[in-house]
Amino acid sequence: MAENAYSKAGVDVEAGYQVVERIKKHVARTERIGAMGALGSFGGMFDLSSLNLKEPVLVSGTDGVGTKLLLAIEADKHDTIGIDCVAMCVNDILAQGAEPLFFLDYIATGKTDPVKMEQIVKGVADGCEQAGAALIGGETAEMPDMYGADDYDLAGFTVGAVEKQKLITEGAVQAGDTLIGIPSSGIHSNGYSLVRKIFFKDNEFTLDAEISELDVPLVEELLKPTRIYVKPVLEVLKEVTVHGITHVTGGGFVENLPRMLTNDLAVKVELGSWPMLPIFDVVKKYGQLNEMEMYEIFNMGIGMVLAVAKSDVEKTLEVLVQNGEAAYVIGEVTTRESNAVIFAGGKKG
């Protein structure tokens, strides 16, 4: 009787049960040392003592995917958007030197489609595997009065740990440090309200539009998952004293690079020191944006930046390459005279 009444209110309890069964195999893939309990418990659990840290500091992060979700919904492609959600969270706590331990997701939708929900959680689990984090819990909320039947929102939450003496804070970066950039896969998960306006409103492209500068259809390019930098950067942290890390997200170079600096420092970025991905030229062209706007909004092909002493540059590059990462020396830290970010060198973009 109660279930029938709930169904009449638009909530499909049976579909929720189906989702749980469908996602179990994906959650199981993310198991790691320290993870405790079973799917369906009231709370997710993690045994911090399993890490053998002397003075553990917990670092937490939460984020969503923004309006990139609208492209996934319109394209009916849901199996990678979860990677974006994980990436946005774990890359942020990595900037403090933390190893991601576990992850939880939150999905709100107008109508629970078990197949779609499984695809979303599959992506979350894929991201957790890349990050080495256990998926220990989550919530799927069916709210027909708040969302359309095909609509959903996705958010994530992660917790990591680092030894207190190895915690990375803005006070460690010094004038003379070298900036090492690690490439992005594309736009990642920021700036999509503008990107969607440029391509689909102002220029009326279709999702499957073929643009000469791109080697895949437009929507495929725009849905490329955000890269997860956890494993290669953790390897660097074992070998090198990294002074600062920036996750280049919303606000691009201009807003994010200063976040690892004290007020007396600036960064000098050598333009042309890394390969520019074609998607940024395409966005600039069709959006009629200037150079500074691009660097204020997008990652411009660099998703993470490490600040290291000059004496550690060679070792840092070596470890990254050994772990399958391309990496580029893209600039240096200087004393600040005016702007916190200075662009110099070759052609912008």
From Swiss-Prot:
GO MF term list: ATP binding; phosphoribosylamine-glycine ligase activity; phosphoribosylformylglycinamidine cyclo-ligase activity
Taxonomic superkingdom: Bacteria
Enzymatic reactions: 2-formamido-N(1)-(5-O-phospho-beta-D-ribosyl)acetamidine + ATP = 5-amino-1-(5-phospho-beta-D-ribosyl)imidazole + ADP + phosphate + H(+)
Main localization category: cytoplasm
Pathway named in the protein's UniProt entry: Purine metabolism; IMP biosynthesis via de novo pathway; 5-amino-1-(5-phospho-D-ribosyl)imidazole from N(2)-formyl-N(1)-(5-phospho-D-ribosyl)glycinamide: step 2/2
InterPro entries referenced in this protein's UniProt entry, alphabetically: PurM-like_C_dom, PurM-like_C_sf, PurM-like_N, PurM-like_N_sf, PurM_cligase
Family listed: Belongs to the AIR synthase family.
Listed name of the protein: Phosphoribosylformylglycinamidine cyclo-ligase
Gene source species: Listeria monocytogenes serovar 1/2a (strain ATCC BAA-679 / EGD-e)
